Regions:
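Residue-level recognition of specific faces of alpha-helices
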Residues: 8, 13, 17, 39-42, ...
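Arg/Lys-rich, positively charged N-terminal/basic patches that mediate binding to nucleic acids
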Residues: 1-33
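Enriched for short, Lys/Arg-rich terminal
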Residues: 68, 72-97
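Catalytic cores of transferase enzymes with a strong primary signal for eukaryotic protein kinases
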Residues: 9, 32, 49, 83, ...
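Low-complexity, intrinsically disordered short peptide segments enriched in small/polar/basic residues
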Residues: 1, 11-14, 37-40, 78, ...
Length: 97
């Protein structure tokens, strides 16, 4: 069983995304949160299944939304370092590694 932790920055990412989607359409943020939760559940079930994007950082793309959950695995611990838009340059998020 893996433990999952979110960095402070990852939590800010999620908060910003949720607020943005709620401004676009009432209830859309809830849809995003459901898809995010499903992505996290998939990571917890099989964290090694997803591709490496940069060094030891893996990404699980979120269904229906253009975001990826970026995380590292160390022993039985998963650390989510960010939730980034797919169009965002790796140079912008690689600073968090």
């Amino acid at each position: 069983m893996y433990l999952i932790h979110f960095t402070k920055e990852a939590l800010f990412d999620i908060e910003d995304i949720v607020l943005w989607y709620e401004e676009q359409r009432i209830g859309l943020s809830y849809d995003f949160e459901l898809c995010l939760e499903a992505g996290i559940d998939t990571i917890l079930r099989n964290p090694a299944a997803f591709q490496k994007r940069h060094k030891e950082v893996k990404v699980r793309f979120i269904s229906r939304f253009p975001y990826g959950i970026h995380y590292r695995i160390k022993e039985k611990e998963i650390t989510v370092i960010g939730v980034f838009h797919t169009s965002r340059s790796p140079k912008n998020w690689s600073k968090r590694i």
